[in-house]
């Protein structure tokens, strides 16, 4: 059974997204990109993020949605801002799609590379390899989103 999965890597400057089709252990990248968030007031940035997500859902339907949880940051302002973006994304996904899966950065790294402490570059290398792509995927926000989708696909196979 083919499953269309949306993976999301939330960020305060860019939000990576990836759409994969998963079928019996074979994953195909359908689309990947960024929701670019321009420097502005927090309210405008959140609006921009939600509008970008609306557009993705308008152009595609999904069986599953997975999002990466926010990472630990040392700057409290950064944590608060990311938490607000994450909250807005969560609400938007719940309104449009319903339930979604959440994975920590360590879970994603472990699922894709086998190492919970892998670097972003190691994740990018494995994403490229797992999908059989010839070109590097840039920026790393996009590879992270693909990794989230791949993690969810692997998790679904384990549960089935």
Curated annotation (Swiss-Prot):
Protein keywords: Cytoplasm, DNA damage, DNA recombination, DNA repair, DNA-binding, Endonuclease, Hydrolase, Magnesium, Metal-binding, Nuclease
A GO term for molecular function: magnesium ion binding
Keyword presence, Transmembrane: no
Subcellular location: Cytoplasm
Major localization listed first in the record, in broad terms: cytoplasm
A single GO cellular-component term on record: Holliday junction resolvase complex
Substrates-to-products reaction catalysed: Endonucleolytic cleavage at a junction such as a reciprocal single-stranded crossover between two homologous DNA duplexes (Holliday junction)
Reported cofactor(s): Mg(2+)
Catalytic residues (positions): 9, 68, 141
Entry EC no(s): 3.1.21.10
Organism domain of life: Bacteria
InterPro entries listed in its UniProt record: RNaseH-like_sf (IPR012337), RNaseH_sf (IPR036397), X-over_junc_endoDNase_Mg_BS (IPR020563), X-over_junc_endoDNase_RuvC (IPR002176)
PANTHER family for this protein: CROSSOVER JUNCTION ENDODEOXYRIBONUCLEASE RUVC
Assembly: Homodimer which binds Holliday junction (HJ) DNA. The HJ becomes 2-fold symmetrical on binding to RuvC with unstacked arms; it has a different conformation from HJ DNA in complex with RuvA. In the full resolvosome a probable DNA-RuvA(4)-RuvB(12)-RuvC(2) complex forms which resolves the HJ.
UniProt record similarity statement: Belongs to the RuvC family.
Function: The RuvA-RuvB-RuvC complex processes Holliday junction (HJ) DNA during genetic recombination and DNA repair. Endonuclease that resolves HJ intermediates. Cleaves cruciform DNA by making single-stranded nicks across the HJ at symmetrical positions within the homologous arms, yielding a 5'-phosphate and a 3'-hydroxyl group; requires a central core of homology in the junction. The consensus cleavage sequence is 5'-(A/T)TT(C/G)-3'. Cleavage occurs on the 3'-side of the TT dinucleotide at the point of strand exchange.
Protein name in UniProt: Crossover junction endodeoxyribonuclease RuvC
Organism of provenance: Campylobacter jejuni (strain RM1221)
Gene name per UniProt: ruvC
């Amino acid at each position: 059974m083919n499953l269309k999965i949306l993976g999301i890597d939330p960020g305060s400057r860019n939000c990576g997204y990836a759409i994969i089709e998963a079928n019996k252990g074979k994953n195909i990248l359908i689309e990947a990109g960024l929701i670019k968030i321009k420097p502005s007031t927090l309210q405008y940035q959140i609006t921009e993020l939600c509008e970008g997500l609306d557009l993705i859902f308008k152009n595609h339907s999904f069986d599953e949605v997975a999002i990466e949880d926010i990472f630990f940051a040392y700057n409290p302002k950064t944590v608060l801002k990311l938490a607000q973006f994450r909250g807005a994304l969560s609400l938007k996904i719940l309104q449009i799609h319903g339930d979604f899966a959440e994975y920590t950065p360590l879970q994603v790294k472990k699922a894709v590379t086998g190492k919970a402490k892998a670097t972003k570059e190691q994740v990018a290398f494995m994403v490229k390899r797992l999908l059989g792509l010839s070109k590097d995927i840039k920026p790393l926000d996009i590879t992270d989103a693909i990794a989230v989708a791949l993690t969810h696909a692997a998790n679904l196979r384990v549960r089935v």
